[in-house]
């Protein structure tokens, strides 16, 4: 699938796959940002995209950043709709007790393109019964 990217900032790094078979490309920060403990920050990538209709871009955490630094994407996955043309930003949250320093050029998240299915919604008086019923939120044990 083809994705058209616009560099909005000279420090913007064009995302690329790190390994054959990867599902996501890495997004990079364009400037340093300090994220205080247990706080969030919007990290700029310096990129805008022309996303094909029928798809969306999802912003997902980088596992190493989450495991080693306790820093992750807050609204994961973040959704970038096909009709959005602004700068791609990444909301990071620092779950640690120390300040996390985002450095310019640092890989901060992954971006994945996925197909979108639109809903045809029908309002009904009742939904069908299943063996699970209304059981949820730990109903099968923890």
From Swiss-Prot:
Organism: Picosynechococcus sp. (strain ATCC 27264 / PCC 7002 / PR-6) (Agmenellum quadruplicatum)
Swiss-Prot/TrEMBL catalytic activity: dUTP + H2O = dUMP + diphosphate + H(+)
SUPFAM superfamilies in alphabetical order: dUTPase-like
Keyword Metal-binding among record annotations: yes
Binding site for substrate: 62-64, 75, 79-81
Cofactor: Mg(2+)
One GO MF term: dUTP diphosphatase activity
Pathway assignment: Pyrimidine metabolism; dUMP biosynthesis; dUMP from dCTP (dUTP route): step 2/2
Protein name: Deoxyuridine 5'-triphosphate nucleotidohydrolase
InterPro entries for this protein: dUTPase, dUTPase-like, dUTPase-like_sf, dUTPase_trimeric
Superkingdom: Bacteria
Protein keywords: Hydrolase, Magnesium, Metal-binding, Nucleotide metabolism
Family: Belongs to the dUTPase family.
Pfam families per UniProt: dUTPase (PF00692)
Enzymatic class: hydrolase
EC number in record: 3.6.1.23
Taxonomic placement: Bacteria, Bacillati, Cyanobacteriota, Cyanophyceae, Oscillatoriophycideae
